[in-house]
Amino acid sequence: MKNINSEIRQQIRNAVINSINKSVETGELPSLEVTDITIEIPREKGHGDFSTNVAMQITKAAKKAPRQIADIIIKNIVTDGTYIDKVTCAGPGFINFTLDNSYLYETVNIIQQEKENYGRINIGNGKKVMVEFVSANPTGPLHMGNARGGALGDCIASVLDAAGYNVTREFLINDAGNQIEKFGTSLEARYIQLIKGEDAIEFPEDGYQGEDITEHMKDFIAIHGDKYINTDSEERKKVFVDFALPRNIARIKEGLESYGIHFDIWFSEQSLHKSGEVAETIQLLKDRGCTVEKEGALWLKGSVIGSEKDEVLVRNNGIPTYFAADIAYHRNKFEKRGFEWVINLWGADHHGHVARMKAAMAALGINPDKLDVVLFQLVRLYRNGEIARMSKRTGKSISLMDLVEEVGRDGVRYFFNTKASGSHLDFDLDLAVKQSNENPVFYVQYAHARICSMFKLLESEGIKVPSANAIKAELLDKPEELELIRKLSEYPDEVRISAETLEPSRLTRYVHDVASTFHSFYNACRVRGEEEELMQARLVLVDCTRIVVKNVLDLLSITAPERM
């Protein structure tokens, strides 16, 4: 796909570097080497279309003031054969580039030709990437942390796919360890209580109290009765877990499906133990001199993971810790399955685990830079201006399913991606269901619906959207028209930056800006009732807006309604 903004950035980059080299040759600048420069879109509209701070970057090496360097670069710059119309200096030494409108008119052509592929780029070159997210505890329902992590992870995966990576979405099923032991103990206690009465056994103080535990055991009893009342406890707990856990996982899958999330792989933690990969990984760490035995347990040396204290890998009862299994799991991702880049989404409370896991990878001979962890902050739900803790429907803690039912999938996914992952998120439930421009998802969807309604009306009058090749694009010269095209031209860059930063919140901000810019255009520039050639040109521009809004919403897995 053609990325005209990328082409322009390269033109600017080449022109600036060539100018610096020429300035060195003429003696206006001392000998220095510049191989790349930062190019950004200025915040101030009057400062051109693109800008670079290269003069400030090389001021020390050039032994001149940034403004003086900028003037020299501008004096020697050659822009023939580029989209650059004007080069100026601003502030302490920013070099600003104003482009001629031909690039905007070419953008209109590109958008209409590429349609749903507009914005897709190829910075990934098919690199094999795994995004592991949600990975909720399978002993209970999906909570708000899972909901936010799900929206973030799914959008990150979609953005990387649009950027040319070969993406796999994975859910780790934590079906081993302490939480499964606690799950089995909770099921066993409830089973005995249902058969013999509540006084027959005390429910574990730290057990799972959810109604699903009771529901599982009632359904189990309906099938098997009291058959297991005298069975050995360990055997009985295994039977109960084998019955209840798949039901919980099925509910998690159902909840995520309703949320628009589809995983390629559901990976069992238990499989790592059964295959011997956990033991194999522990042995590898031992062979590399990374472990120490003490107090009857096996520890990973703190010096290996940059910690003041050692970490237990195998307890004194011979059972590996979750940390050991997690190291084996990450080794499996890289070495067994060949992923070149692994991205995990974890709650911010896991921040201390990031450095340890990266260090563990390094200890295994795996490049830790191939592992990235996106940490996301907590969510607070608000209703009527107060923190909402209970579901309207159930009167219990709000689960993901409750949230989707109350707000709708589109609203939930959009709102969870409005803030950077590292920021706390206040989710206004009342705002998310408002049918007004105050609601950002409604505002964006309305822009798409408004365009579709316009086209339907025009089609009933025999007017169709022409091909961009058939219009006089130069008629689009009003500030509102040019600003809208300029905004549409930024989409491939937004995909690129979102992929590089793993921040899909850029896309919700961007599509809201597109909708806002479109509404400004629509209020300032008539489409129907204008002279024929101008109407045709504006129809193409409106169609390009529809394409971009839909493409962004598709990337966010949010519907683009044709009427509202």
Curated annotation (Swiss-Prot):
Q: What is its main location?
A: cytoplasm
- Keyword hit for Nucleotide-binding: yes
Quote the SMART domains the UniProt record gives. Arg_tRNA_synt_N, DALR_1
Q: Which SUPFAM superfamilies match?
A: Anticodon-binding domain of a subclass of class I aminoacyl-tRNA synthetases (SSF47323), Arginyl-tRNA synthetase (ArgRS), N-terminal 'additional' domain (SSF55190), Nucleotidylyl transferase (SSF52374)
Report which superkingdom the organism of origin falls in.
Answer: Bacteria
> Secretion signal: which residues?
none
Q: What EC numbers are recorded for this enzyme? A: 6.1.1.19
Does the record carry Aminoacyl-tRNA synthetase as a key word? yes
Q: How does it assemble?
A: Monomer.
This one is known as Arginine--tRNA ligase
Q: Which source organism? A: Ruminiclostridium cellulolyticum (strain ATCC 35319 / DSM 5812 / JCM 6584 / H10)
State the taxonomy lineage: Bacteria, Bacillati, Bacillota, Clostridia, Eubacteriales
